[in-house]
Amino acid sequence: MDGIIQIISAFIVIIEIIIGWFGNGFIVLVNCMHWIKRRRISTVNQILTALAFSRIYLLLTVFTVILASVQYSNILVTRREVKVIIFHLITSNHFSMWLAACLGLFYFLKIANFSNFIFVFLKKRVNKVVSGTLLMSLVFLFLNTLLINSYIDAQIDDYRGYLLYDFTSNITVSFYRVILVINNCIFTSIPFALSQSTFLMLIFSLWRHYKKMQQHAQRCRDTLTNAHIKVLQTMIMYVLLSAIFFLFLSMQIWRNKLMENILFIRFCETVAAVFPSGHSCVLIWGDTNLRQTFLSVLWWLKHRFTLWVPKLYCR
């Protein structure tokens, strides 16, 4: 019974991965086509394209790990192989989280309205701030990789140079739990906190702007209010998805009887996989150009389908 549930869980994750590939691939394709057509690309589209690439990389890495765990569940992996697996997981997750945080930071600096001189200074240099934030994140990536490699070197020696590639094994679960502690509690929490901060500051900016409108007896929405609401709608979904992702990934760290159950671990992984896949759908729906293109593609597919079905019955 446990084996059947694990297979179902793996199947659901694979479906989520396929949806994520299509969603993020669509973002990359549309933005690249507009880039070629117009011979220029905006900063927000650069971030969106890079974010979509990082999500494709993350989902591909997760898919490879799942496939390998199913096909080769009882083989021994060497120190180098463990490091390669962990490096790709850390790197893909790092850029996925930090690029999403940079996107939120970009929206915040572009749309929020504060009279503070520091904010005004950063607002005028929004592109440099975003680039600097992304470059600074590479320092955290280096430290993260260094700490985890040191841990792997120390632990693999205790396991006589090899580790069983079996995620149902208590030894393997304990080994990867410490890696989750280092990656999630220390490093992934930084871009997560940045995203939450920009989201809260956007809400505060909208509240202040709304108060000013009431003082001037303006009841209708202006352009700035609409921009706030549009971005907040996208960011609310991102905050919810990232919070669920962070929560269920962090739950695998807890040392209790529930976390010794491999089925609960699989459930956490299934829920966590919703974030990189579901967020791509949110980004498509929140961007006017991407949404219109997506609806045009759906209309074209529907039109082709209505033409194809009668021909099929005529045969």
Swiss-Prot record:
Membrane-topology annotation of the record: Multi-pass membrane protein
InterPro entries: TAS2R (IPR007960)
Gene Ontology biological process terms in this record: detection of chemical stimulus involved in sensory perception of bitter taste
Gene3D superfamilies: Rhodopsin 7-helix transmembrane proteins (1.20.1070.10)
Segments on the Cytoplasmic side according to the record's topology features: 31-46, 123-128, 207-233, 288-315
Alphabetical UniProt keywords: G-protein coupled receptor, Glycoprotein, Membrane, Receptor, Sensory transduction, Taste, Transducer, Transmembrane, Transmembrane helix
Glycan attachment positions: 170
Topological region Extracellular: 1-9, 68-101, 150-185, 255-266
Family listed: Belongs to the G-protein coupled receptor T2R family.
Further facts: Several bitter taste receptors are expressed in a single taste receptor cell.
Function (record text): Putative taste receptor which may play a role in the perception of bitterness.
Protein name as annotated: Taste receptor type 2 member 129
Biological classification of the source: Eukaryota, Metazoa, Chordata, Craniata, Vertebrata
